[in-house]
Amino acid sequence: AEKEDLLRTVYLQEPVIDYEATVQVDGKVKEHRYACSGIDGLTFGPAFGDPKGKKQYLYVAYGVYGDTTRSDNDHQVILKYDIDKWGKYESHLLQGKLHRSGPKKAMSKYFVKTGNSTYGIQNLAYDAYTGNFYAAVYRGKKSIFPNYDLFVIDGSKKATKGIITTDNKAEKVEMLQLANGGRKDANTGITGWVFPWGSTGLCPVGGG
C-alpha cells in the first residue's frame, strides 16, 4: 500500500486522546478514558433520527477494555464524522512515519448503555431495511449485566441527553437507544440477542 499508492488515510485524533488519557475511576487511577482500547467496528449510515436521510456519515466504534474492576466501561462509544470534505486530510500511509492529518474532533460522540463487553463493538453495520445499526461484541463478564453478543441501536430515534461518570465526575453526553426486540433483561432493561457469530462479521444484504 505504501509503494503502489492504493489508498489514502485520515488520522482520527479523538480516539487517540481518550486512549492515552489517565483517569480516576472509583478512587483508583486507570489508563484510558472510557476504557478506550482504540477503534474497532465502523459503518456508514444516515443521521440518527433520520433513517430515510440520503446523507451518509461515518460511524466509528471504540474498542472498550472489559476490565471488570472499573465502572466506566459499561457503555459503547460511537463517533460520528461528516466525511464530505475529508479530501483535505487524505495522506499516504507510511507505517514508519505516521501522519497526523485529520479532524480534531468528531461531529458527535454517542454513548449506548449495553453493559460490559470484551473489547467493545467488533462489528458495526447499518441495515437500510430496518434503519437500525447492528453492533456485535464479545460477551462481557460482569454478572450484573445480561452480557448479550449482539445489540441493535434504534436508528429512528435521535440521541438524547444523558449523564455518565468518568474521571470521578459527571459528564453530559449524547445517548443512543437500543431497539426493542430480542431478549430484555428485567434488572437493567437492556435488550439484545445471543448471537456469538456477529463478532466475526456482519453484512446486511437487504430484505430483513
Walk through the language-model features, giving the residues of each:
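Short acidic, low-complexity segments enriched in Ser/Thr/Gly/Pro
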Residues: E2-R33
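Short coil/turn segments at the loop-to-beta-strand junctions that recur within blades
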Residues: L6, L12-I17, H99, S117-Y119, ...
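A short beta-strand motif characteristic of beta-propeller blades
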Residues: V10, V25-H32, A106-T114, G182-G192
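Residue-level signature of beta-propeller blades and closely related beta-rich strand-turn architectures
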Residues: V16-D18, F48, Y62-G66, Y138-K141
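Structural signature of eukaryotic scaffold interfaces centered on beta-propeller domains
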Residues: Q24-Y59, G63-G66, S117-G131, W193-G207
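Loop/turn-rich, solvent-exposed surfaces of beta-rich toroidal or solenoidal domains
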Residues: T114-G192, G198-G201
